[in-house]
Each structure stands twice: as C-alpha cells, then as structure tokens.
Amino acid sequence: MLLMLAQWLQDDFGFFRVFNYITFRAVMATVTALLIGLAAGPWVIRKLAALKVGQAVRTDGPQTHLVKSGTPTMGGVLILIGIFISCILWADLSNRFIWIVMIVTFGFGLVGWVDDYRKVVYKDPKGMASRGKFFWQTLIGLFAAIYLAFSVSEVNNLKVLQLFYKWLRSGFALDLPAKTNLLLPFMKEVSYPLGIMGFIILSYLVIVGSSNAVNLTDGLDGLVIMPVILVGAALGAFAYVMGNAIYAKYLLFPYIPGAGELMIFCGAMGGAGLAFLWYNTHPAQVFMGDVGALALGGALGTIAVIVRQEIVLFVMGGIFVAETISVMLQVFWFKVTKKHFGEGRRIFRMAPLHHHFELGGWKETQVVVRFWIITILLVLIGLSSLKLR
C-alpha cells in the first residue's frame, strides 16, 4: 500500500524512490511487525487470559511442565496480526506470490484456530477431528500447489491462465518450463524435471508437511519460533536472489519474476516472530498454539516451493524434520510391538524428540538453545548452496 503511494509521490518528492528497493521495504516490514507485536502483546495476552484459553499440559510428560497449565495459548494470533498488517503496508500488493503465501498462511492459521478453540473452549483434548483437519490442510495445500504449478514460471496471472488453458487443450500432456524443475543444491545447473503432476504432488507434500512439522516442534518455551525466523530469513535471501535477473544469472539460479517480493513477507515474519519470542521466552507468558504453528509452517513450505528450494528447506529445517520423524517412528514401533508382543514399546522416552531429551536430564532451556544452535548451523549450510555449486 505504501509502495503505491510512494510511486505516486516520487516524481515530486525524490526521497520516496527508496520505497522501490525491496531491501528497504523488507527492513521496514521487519521493524513494523516487531513494533506491532511488542505493542499489542500485553493486550492480546490479557484478552486470551480473560477468555480462559489456557494450555492443557500432558500429565505423562516432564513434571516441570505442570506449572505451565493454564498459560494462555493461541498466541500465534499475535504473530499473524503483525505479518498481515506489515505486508499490507510494505509489500507490492499487485504481486501474486505475496497473496498466495498470505492465503496459505491465513488458511492454515484458521484450521489451527478451530483446533485450538475446540481444545481450550470445549475442553476437547483431541481438538479438531484428525480427518477434518487433514481434509482442510489438503484442500489448502492442493490449491496452492496447483496454482504454483502454473505460476512459478510466468510473470502475471494472465500468463498463468494462458498456461493452464494450454495444458487443458493439450490433454494434460503439456510439459512445464524448466524453471519448475526440482533444483539439486550444491550442483551446478543440475535439476530434475517433475512434470505438472509431480510438481503438484511434491509441492503439496512440502506445504502440508512443513505445516505439521513446525506444529510438532512447538512444545517448549521459545523452541519453534527461532528456527522459523532463521529458516524464513534464509528463504528470504533465496527469494531476493531468484527474483533478481542479474543475481540469479550470476549464481546460476532460474530467474523467477516477482519472487523477490517474498523478502517482505519473510521480514514481516521475522519481526513478528521476534516480538512473540519476547513474550514466549522461558517462562512463557503465552503459547503459540496451532493457529501460529500450522500457519508459519505452511508459509515456509509455500515460499520454499516458489523459490524452488524444497531440498534446502529440508536441510535448514532439520529440527522440524527430526521432530516429525521421531513421532512417526515412535507411533510405528509402538503399533508393531503391540501387535507382536501384546504391549507397545517405545524407541524414545517420549515423542516429539525434545521431550526425549528433557526426560533424559536436559533442562528445558538447554534443549531450546541447543536446538537453536543446530538450526543456525543447518541454515548456514543451506545458505552456502547459494555459491557452492
């Protein structure tokens, strides 16, 4: 919104030309979201506490968590408010990628809100029925995946519709441009053609998988938000490079017109995340809830698909991956051993993985900071693929 105003005024007031720089608007989006979060935080926390949306704590988990019972949850609303207001102010609202990421973020956030609401208001520990949650996640994920299959290689929505029409006329046999290929990190100009169905399936898995992986990681004070900020910032760097024809050519990446604007969203997500961390750091005054975790994970997955960095997301989000795998292995092994031995056995003391380390003697803050350190290292590895090719 401010960009349109600045472009209208820049002929008379030259200093407004600074708004044309994505880097400037990304910084301002970060600061704006941070200030909104810090200012609105106390009010949001008071409202959540007044509504008695307190977090229920598992009695079979670490006993140190019992004191957290009743702490307001659904604090992810604070993050989403900061992101959306900041993006509306600083992003180019004619950019199709900004809108698809915001739609996915809002959609997953809405699913998470319903899940949280049922848990804390209706006192239903299961929350939203798993089938219902999966249905809505699938609907949102497929919508984004199908749109991006025809959007990543084009410059505007008219071209997107034309490509989609060509695909229909070809009897679903049209090949996508090379820009939609799966990029292999650390490999110079090596990519794997996915085809339209392959692109849609992979994109769906990345978007929905990332959403659920971030949600599983959200279990300790401050644990998930810092990795989200770090991975989001790195994806913002990839978006800036691949949205710039000169940098993309120099670094041997496909040029994706409009992708650079996602740096604004990543900046807003980082600023809103830091503001949330201010209130979520141990001992937490508020928890993120599914409304925040599902939304942020979906946003990361969608951005990774747009900038063709699905594998790099897998690397940089290694903590999310490890947490998810720990849950899958625990459930699988429990069911297998129960079937064969009559009682379920466990691989980990408790899943997700962060609880395993807690029950092993690590303090909560030790788990959190060490997971942050691991994420920093993984993000540096991911960023190195910008040049090491």
From Swiss-Prot:
GO terms for molecular function: metal ion binding; phospho-N-acetylmuramoyl-pentapeptide-transferase activity; UDP-N-acetylmuramoyl-L-alanyl-D-glutamyl-meso-2,6-diaminopimelyl-D-alanyl-D-alanine:undecaprenyl-phosphate transferase activity. It comes from the Bacteria. One of its GO terms (biological process) is peptidoglycan biosynthetic process. The keyword Transmembrane helix applies. Keywords: Cell cycle, Cell division, Cell inner membrane, Cell membrane, Cell shape, Cell wall biogenesis/degradation, Magnesium, Membrane, Metal-binding, Peptidoglycan synthesis, Transferase, Transmembrane, Transmembrane helix. NCBIfam families: mraY (TIGR00445). It comes from Polynucleobacter necessarius subsp. necessarius (strain STIR1). It catalyses: UDP-N-acetyl-alpha-D-muramoyl-L-alanyl-gamma-D-glutamyl-meso-2,6-diaminopimeloyl-D-alanyl-D-alanine + di-trans,octa-cis-undecaprenyl phosphate = di-trans,octa-cis-undecaprenyl diphospho-N-acetyl-alpha-D-muramoyl-L-alanyl-D-glutamyl-meso-2,6-diaminopimeloyl-D-alanyl-D-alanine + UMP. Its main location: membrane. Pathway: Cell wall biogenesis; peptidoglycan biosynthesis. The gene is mraY. One of its GO terms (cellular component) is plasma membrane. Its EC number is 2.7.8.13. The chain crosses the membrane at residues 25-45, 73-93, 97-117, 134-154, 190-210, 222-242, 258-278, 286-306, 311-331, 366-386. It is found in: Cell inner membrane. This is Phospho-N-acetylmuramoyl-pentapeptide-transferase. It is a multi-pass membrane protein. Catalyzes the initial step of the lipid cycle reactions in the biosynthesis of the cell wall peptidoglycan: transfers peptidoglycan precursor phospho-MurNAc-pentapeptide from UDP-MurNAc-pentapeptide onto the lipid carrier undecaprenyl phosphate, yielding undecaprenyl-pyrophosphoryl-MurNAc-pentapeptide, known as lipid I. It is an enzyme of class 2 (transferase). Its cofactor is Mg(2+). Belongs to the glycosyltransferase 4 family. MraY subfamily.
